[in-house]
């Protein structure tokens, strides 16, 4: 999965790529989702008012991070119907006045 963060002037801020198969010594998956990786890389200083481009609709944990970071718009390519937190994520984003746009033609 991928994520790209751009500011209100459409300037690139950060890119994130979800890492798979990253486990700690106890076998737990410790890889952050692409959304979280983007926010870590942006250091939180440039995310307010920005747009986040995602490969798939964000999970609830990523939605919380999106709201906290002050991101104003989320553009995504694919639905993730297997995510049990999808409806909670949608409610949180909608109630936080974040614009959500599905763009199946998104290419990155």
Report each predicted region and the residues it spans:
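Zinc-dependent deaminase catalytic domain
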Residues: 1-108
């Amino acid at each position: 999965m991928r994520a790209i963060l751009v500011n209100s002037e459409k300037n690139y801020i950060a890119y994130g790529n979800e890492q798979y198969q990253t486990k700690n010594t106890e076998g737990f998956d410790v890889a952050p989702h692409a959304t979280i990786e983007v926010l870590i890389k942006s250091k939180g200083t440039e995310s307010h008012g920005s747009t986040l481009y995602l490969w798939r609709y964000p999970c609830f944990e990523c939605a919380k991070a999106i709201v906290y970071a002050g991101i104003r718009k989320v553009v995504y390519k694919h639905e993730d119907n297997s995510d049990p937190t999808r409806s909670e994520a949608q409610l949180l984003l909608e109630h936080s006045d974040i614009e959500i746009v599905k763009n199946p033609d998104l290419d990155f």
